[in-house]
């Protein structure tokens, strides 16, 4: 049994109404036929997905707080906002691992180094299936660095560093993230981890919002017309038992609105796995992918 602090959502609430129509788009650089639309219960297969993970703030801290987080609220208003999204535990590290590998690995505290070898994870499954993956960490001293901390960089927020099946070349500093003229070169799935000041861990909500706007708003706009997706979520709330967090999907053919099905990191992982036809890893197995937010 996995440790989870999320609420329980009645099964009846996840009925047929939660299966909206969707389309499939083939990742750039992956051999494929032209994009086609599939059955109504499908999940889009985007050319590019960028996942951004913020730190230690609850749903109510962010959503509606247009003074400190105007850009994040713009994304929430224009994209799909999951209003019943929960982290799985405390503290930070196991939540990152839950979203990346479907497992908290029994952690009850942040640890470095945490060596999980070739345990299957989202990145390794993408690579094995012929897709591409990269993790971009702000402040990482160099590609593939195994250092635990360096300035405002902390490896505990970059879960791929814990696995030997993610090549060093796929563990990059954020400075290597493509410029706006070259977003088409992005891997199939990217994770972006701001540093401790820019992800709300040490810095303010306003600082994190400004960083996201400055560094990824151009990608978000580009995504809406280039078969791509941005996911912005949080590792955990501010250490309450409720552990409700914002999760926002923004991009092409995301159906604007608020969605109240109960989700956690495992459900988001399951959605990405089904998006690319990957094997389910860890506790994402049997979880419900998100199917009702797509046009």
Regions found by a protein language model. Give the residues of each.
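Secretory targeting and sorting signals
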Residues: 1-31
């Amino acid at each position: 049994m996995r440790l989870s602090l999320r609420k329980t959502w009645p099964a009846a609430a996840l009925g047929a109404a939660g299966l909206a129509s969707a389309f499939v788009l083939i990742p750039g650089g992956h051999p494929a036929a032209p994009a086609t639309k599939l059955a109504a219960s499908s999940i889009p297969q985007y050319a590019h997905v960028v996942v951004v993970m913020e730190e230690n703030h609850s749903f109510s801290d962010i959503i509606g707080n247009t003074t400190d987080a105007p850009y994040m609220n713009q994304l929430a208003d224009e994209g799909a906002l999951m209003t019943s999204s929960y982290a799985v535990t405390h503290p930070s590290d196991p939540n990152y691992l839950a979203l990346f590998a479907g497992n908290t690995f029994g952690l009850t505290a942040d640890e470095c180094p945490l060596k999980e070898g070739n345990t299957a994870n989202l990145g390794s499954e993408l690579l094995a299936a012929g897709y591409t993956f990269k993790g971009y960490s702000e402040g990482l001293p160099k590609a593939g660095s195994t250092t635990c901390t360096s300035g405002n960089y902390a490896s505990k927020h970059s879960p791929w560093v814990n696995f030997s099946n993610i090549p060093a070349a796929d563990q990059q500093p954020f400075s290597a993230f493509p410029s706006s003229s070259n977003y088409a070169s992005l891997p199939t799935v990217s994770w972006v981890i701001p540093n401790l000041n820019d992800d709300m861990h040490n810095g303010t909500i306003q600082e994190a919002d400004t960083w996201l706007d400055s560094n990824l708003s151009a990608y978000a706009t580009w995504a809406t017309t280039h078969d791509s997706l941005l996911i912005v979520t949080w590792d955990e709330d501010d250490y309450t038992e409720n552990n409700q967090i914002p999760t926002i999907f923004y991009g092409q053919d995301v159906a604007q609105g608020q969605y109240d099905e109960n989700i956690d990191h495992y459900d988001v992982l399951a959605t990405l796995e089904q998006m690319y036809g990957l094997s389910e890893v860890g506790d994402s197995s049997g979880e419900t992918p998100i199917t009702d937010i797509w046009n």
